[in-house]
Swiss-Prot record:
Name used for this protein in its record: Probable ABC transporter permease protein y4oQ
Topology in the lipid bilayer: Multi-pass membrane protein
Stretches assigned to the ABC transmembrane type-1 domain: 85-296
Pfam name, any one: BPD_transp_1
Keyword terms, alphabetized: Cell inner membrane, Cell membrane, Membrane, Plasmid, Transmembrane, Transmembrane helix, Transport
Family affiliation: Belongs to the binding-protein-dependent transport system permease family. MalFG subfamily.
Main localization category: membrane
Gene Ontology terms describing biological process: transmembrane transport
Amino acid sequence: MTISQTVPRGAVAVRRRRRIRISTVVWFTMPAAAIMLLVLGVPLVYSFYYSLTGWSLVVPGSDQDFIGLLNYTDVLRSSEFWAAIRVTLIYAVVAVSLECALGILFAVLLNLEFFGRGLFRSLMLIPMVITPAVVGIFWKLLYEQDSGVFNYLLGTLGFEPVPWLSLTVALASVIIVDVWQSTPFFTLIILAGLQSLDRDTVSAAQADGANALQVFRYLTLPHLVPYIMIAAAFRIIGVMADFDKIFLLTLGGPGNVTTTLSVYAYNTGFKVFDIGRTTAISWIYVVFVLAISAPLIWRLFRGASVNRH
């Protein structure tokens, strides 16, 4: 006895349409992908090549001096490089942690019903939409020791002026500026998460006797974890790449207390004019950022995949 299995014509038609749709998407995407490959790929290849040379702007023809991995080993042996790594890590960890905490606080407040909530939301967006260069200039004026607004206010209250950009507090002052500008980003992401929370679940928990703190701890916070991770991943990458504000506020000083990796790369390229070493620093910087942000991104996509299945 023979059992024959036939595939319904509808299923075959569905698969055929799916293949056609996928191939159409691929063909329409290929021109843009090719342009992106040229625009991004070619400079990356050239920069990696130059990181293997002894190219210096003060030595004609040095862009052809192939020296292998010498730039990388010199950078990794440099105490200035590791000092920049330390400053970058402190800057990133403290700034992103404060932005996350304040973002959660402001998002919870903005999720409540109160008079003027729309105005407050609009005002919160202002720091985020200002370009970093303008933010750096604006806060440098506020931080001026003799004529700055902050020290003027302290003087009217009877306090001594604070050297905001001095050796001891310069990094903290730079962190304050980044927190001021980037907390709204965290707030918007987390507010979107709060507004997607199932109200029926919250109402059921409250009906069972859960207080506000318990609802936040066991329902709201776990629901917000993916949103916090998205915001944290973007902000870690953003903080690592931050240059404008730091350069305009402190030039990386006093000394090297605010010299992050981006400022260190700039100083090497545009003060020492060592392009080969600068490109090596840039590639090390890329690996450094990926090593920190990749676990967050991987966990985020892994959680999304688990939730989908």
